[in-house]
Amino acid sequence: MAQVAVSTLPVEEESSSETRMVVTFLVSALESMCKELAKSKAEVACIAVYETDVFVVGTERGCAFVNARTDFQKDFAKYCVAEGLCEVKPPCPVNGMQVHSGETEILRKAVEDYFCFCYGKALGTTVMVPVPYEKMLRDQSAVVVQGLPEGVAFQHPENYDLATLKWILENKAGISFIINRPFLGPESQLGGPGMVTDAERSIVSPSESCGPINVKTEPMEDSGISLKAEAVSVKKESEDPNYYQYNMQGSHPSSTSNEVIEMELPMEDSTPLVPSEEPNEDPEAEVKIEGNTNSSSVTNSAAGVEDLNIVQVTVPDNEKERLSSIEKIKQLREQVNDLFSRKFGEAIGVDFPVKVPYRKITFNPGCVVIDGMPPGVVFKAPGYLEISSMRRILEAAEFIKFTVIRPLPGLELSNVGKRKIDQEGRVFQEKWERAYFFVEVQNIPTCLICKQSMSVSKEYNLRRHYQTNHSKHYDQYMERMRDEKLHELKKGLRKYLLGSSDTECPEQKQVFANPSPTQKSPVQPVEDLAGNLWEKLREKIRSFVAYSIAIDEITDINNTTQLAIFIRGVDENFDVSEELLDTVPMTGTKSGNEIFSRVEKSLKNFCIDWSKLVSVASTGTPAMVDANNGLVTKLKSRVATFCKGAELKSICCIIHPESLCAQKLKMDHVMDVVVKSVNWICSRGLNHSEFTTLLYELDSQYGSLLYYTEIKWLSRGLVLKRFFESLEEIDSFMSSRGKPLPQLSSIDWIRDLAFLVDMTMHLNALNISLQGHSQIVTQMYDLIRAFLAKLCLWETHLTRNNLAHFPTLKLASRNESDGLNYIPKIAELQTEFQKRLSDFKLYESELTLFSSPFSTKIDSVHEELQMEVIDLQCNTVLKTKYDKVGIPEFYKYLWGSYPKYKHHCAKILSMFGSTYICEQLFSIMKLSKTKYCSQLKDSQWDSVLHIAT
């Protein structure tokens, strides 16, 4: 709560300390209401004027707005003072009894309002609901009031003394209402036909209902109607527990008729609000008018509205967030109601949801037992549940179970038949395509994202599927981007249903459908398809604002070295593409000059702009990174020629270092024994069969051993792990075949094997993490940095003989100092990793600026980017979007006022972190280019590989 002193107010005689305390309590209550509204994502700002003080309460943004408008505060204070001067000053009390009575009435009114607010909160709404004091006192178990002072019973505030009222307001945060059994009698329907008028309210006992909330507002500019005091109430329908009606009862002083303006907000009706006849851009809430029985029928004409003093209610743009929150609460109730309906249907033996008779279950305890409800949550209709209770129910959905003990009175379960979906008349609506990414395929709603189909064209089912599975990733697409994504997903569905030929090259559809018998070559359609893809690739490359290349080589079955060139580019919309650019056979020398000439020729074929080349990723061989004649050196020279001042970044593949670092362990004495014994067992069929039988007889956890190959690095860790866990069986089998291995009985050798098992498993985990699809270079760099930190931790633990992260070594350890023997090996691994990451450390500041733009220090940013980065870090809107979507999606929302920073981010996003994509291509090549089809032309192989990738 902010308090602002205004000097323009006349200083009157100071009030008593008790009066000021009362004002403080009331403002505190107003602040509590603002906090509750803020939970519904509503922005509120309130200004209260008392004597010479101005109190500002509300949400954080609301208070910031009012505090920034000091002129608005002063004008409001002057207005309040001017209005007060016009009124007749009441005579001073003769004694202090009248003042004391006035303070008591104010406190009593505040307590009564807070009780109404707590009761409304217990009903699941944020508005104040009149408290049925008489019914609560008659049936004290129906509603429990917690937090009252010890020895003080709940009753109407008019029965409390001044001290009790003050205590309640001071400790109101701990007071809450818990509804165990709702009041469902017809006479208790709030806002029903029996609602009294203002004249009648004056003679009704205060225990019947909470008084109206008086709100003073400025008159509207376009009408002479001023909004007077409004009485807000909530009417609960007995038949449908998910239906609420919010009534605003007019209390115009000059009105003698009982006219009610009733706003209906059904919890399940999804029909959009009907706009008024008067054109207005803002959406309008539907207004239902109820008049006297003696009054004439009300029309929609302007005259009718004028006669009844009805104020049109509009929903401004700044209330969209509040309406969104109401919609979420509505959906939450629908989900709970659907859950209860499905569980009740299962209880009565049907496979579809059945409407739950909440009233019959409540008033007939023992007929239906509900198990699995969260602790402290009582079963009741979703309309009576709090938001937190509904969320807990959904979390425990799989544990909730309905059991019918005996039939419910008046409910014939035998009449519940099979569900006839075809008679429900449901029709798929076109707007669901854009809202939930669903289309109708042969009268069946099908999800465009996961291709899952729904049995019924029901919006709730489609919305629940979308929000449960896809909203996290697809809510970010708005307006035009959402339409483009919908079009893209539709094309993907067509490809999924009809095959890829219609999508990739529609002009060749007949060629694939009806191949000509006169075709001379069976591979001609493949070349035509690839030709179409080459043209698309050229068009895509022209749209790149930055790109990088990755180069690696392999020897195929014909003993020919194949050089693979991949390109990774980013367009102006920050869409990333990775494509195979070319495969070049290296038949001559493999020098840097020869490789450069082949790469240059391939880049010219696609008319690539050298000035947009950002980096090159390679394996780090001398032909690639030689300082004089290496490929990277010549590429840097060429880029500098086309773009002065530009520097080509060179990245050595960081997937291979772990296999190279393994050589630094120098544990060949372990690997040689393992490889020799495993290959001897697995390479001979008889040995392998007998060994498998032995493992089966010994009831071992493995039925065989893995064959070790030096080509596959991952096989080393798997072989070592299985070898260690089958050590006794292998020793017994080798001894029975006359090939004993004395190392298998050596404690030191077994301990070295255990350390190697743990270390290779750690390296394998790193390798798998680095091989993720389409990883950003910053993510891969973070993984390597994390592994370096782990190495430092392991070294520290080994000095203390802490083997917590070496479980296999811990099993084989027999001495408290066994861990000290492997500290030098960990240190060698650290040195090797740091050496191979030296390239990344050169660009560490640029990578950090991309991955953490809002926490980067300005001093570490390049001078040409500093101004834009400062503007970005001070932009709270973009900071919120960054926290919500993260990178790289955040950069799609970056505004055009950051051109230099956007270009910097595009360059970082285009960088390859490794040549793993080349290794994927080589795997495809080994599977495709066998000795049976190795005679195809190079152009034909390019087409096959390009389609495969």
UniProtKB/Swiss-Prot annotation:
GTF2I-like-type repeats, residues? 98-192, 323-417
A Pfam family annotated for this UniProt entry: GTF2I
Quote the Gene3D superfamilies the UniProt record gives.
Answer: GTF2I-like (3.90.1460.10)
**Record's keyword annotation contains Repeat:** yes
Tissue specificity as recorded in UniProt: Ubiquitous.
Q: Which GO terms describe its molecular function?
A: DNA binding; DNA-binding transcription factor activity, RNA polymerase II-specific
The question of whether Transcription regulation is a record keyword is answered with yes
GO cellular component annotations, sorted alphabetically?
A: nucleus
Which superkingdom?
Eukaryota
Instruction: List the subcellular locations.
Output: Nucleus
Keyword annotations from UniProtKB, A to Z: DNA-binding, Nucleus, Repeat, Transcription, Transcription regulation, Williams-Beuren syndrome
The text of the family note is: Belongs to the TFII-I family.
**Disease implicated:** GTF2IRD2 is located in the Williams-Beuren syndrome (WBS) critical region. WBS results from a hemizygous deletion of several genes on chromosome 7q11.23, thought to arise as a consequence of unequal crossing over between highly homologous low-copy repeat sequences flanking the deleted region.
Official protein name in the record: General transcription factor II-I repeat domain-containing protein 2A
Name the gene.
GTF2IRD2
